[in-house]
Amino acid sequence: MADDKDAWLAATVEQPIDADEEIVDPHHHLWDFPAGTYLVPELHEDTGAGHNVTQTVFVECAAGYHTSGPEHMRPVGETEFVREQAAISAESGGATISAIVSFADLTLGNAVEEVLAAHDAAGEGLFRGIRHANAWDGSDQIRESHTKPPPELLADPDFRAGYATLGRMGFSFDGWMFHTQVAELVDLAHAVPDTPVVLDHLGGPLGIGPYADRRDEVRAVVRPALEALARHPQVTVKVGGIGMSIYGVGFKRLPQAPSSEHVAATWSDDIRHCIETFGPDRCMFESNFPVDKQGCSYTVLFNAFQRICDEAGYTAAERADLFAGTARRFYRVGPPA
């Protein structure tokens, strides 16, 4: 099956539109699971395909957990695993993994401080924050996120105490949720304003199950929620996730992988609305690889982002924020060595 996917992707070949524009990719995963491997060699095959990707940020995916010890401390194994991968990336000459976003159960409340301190120690200067995904929908056709969250997790008092602890300790929160839940993040951002937060993947605009072929109705829900969220200055947005099949745009059903023109045409309105709502200084283009590899290649994805920027007429300074600057500021990523 992997060979079929590789052949499907390889059928669409593009050169970078701008091979010099610096990119800090603020969202990718790494894993070594029975179903597949995506480690530094695979990451560098993608980031080194033509665009100028200098640094990256790893985001949790339940990889490398400890298999023994207290349950709440086991996710620290992922930080240790990625720290080792980061060292390999620094030695191998490609994009350097320069920050780590891990998992901790924020419903531990104030007691999550122990887990955060352990992540920070394990990261050896790379740990930046936590993603505790809350993506949930009442439809049995929509699979919830890997954390198996209950509905309305962001309103849980214990969760909010853990979320506040993140900010108090100087760490950030990555929010992964569906479009129907973004309003819950608005409430959380209002109630606990001191924790920096980045909303992943354009706010999760679903396009399958009960949301299939209802894109305008989904927009009518998510866009006002994004506009309300943008009023909270501690909130930033990741612009990406657009290759995921749950968004229902049908890339996987094409006879060959889409071109950057196709990807840009499919997503330009939504991406430009997000950027215009938050401003380029609070938006960052992300790959979400290898998950988004189900939809297009890395080069096609970043060509699509560059096409959208060209179409919108963003200035050099605005583009610098979108492709690198916002990610550097939010995740406190210094310049490459």
Predicted regions located by residue number:
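Mid-to-C-terminal alpha-helical segments outside catalytic/metal-binding sites
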Residues: 1-22, 26, 38-46, 54-55, ...
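Catalytic pocket-lining loop regions of alpha/beta-barrel enzymes
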Residues: 149-284
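Histidine-centered catalytic micro-motifs
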Residues: 21-33, 199-202
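Active-site gating/metal-coordination segments in enzymes
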Residues: 2-8, 72-181, 187-190, 203, ...
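Structural preference for beta-strand elements that scaffold enzyme active sites
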Residues: 22-25, 55-58, 94-101, 125-131, ...
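Active-site metal-binding loops of divalent metal-dependent hydrolases
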Residues: 28, 134, 202, 288-289
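Short loop/turn segments at strand-loop or loop-helix junctions that form parts
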Residues: 57-64, 131-136, 199-202, 239-243
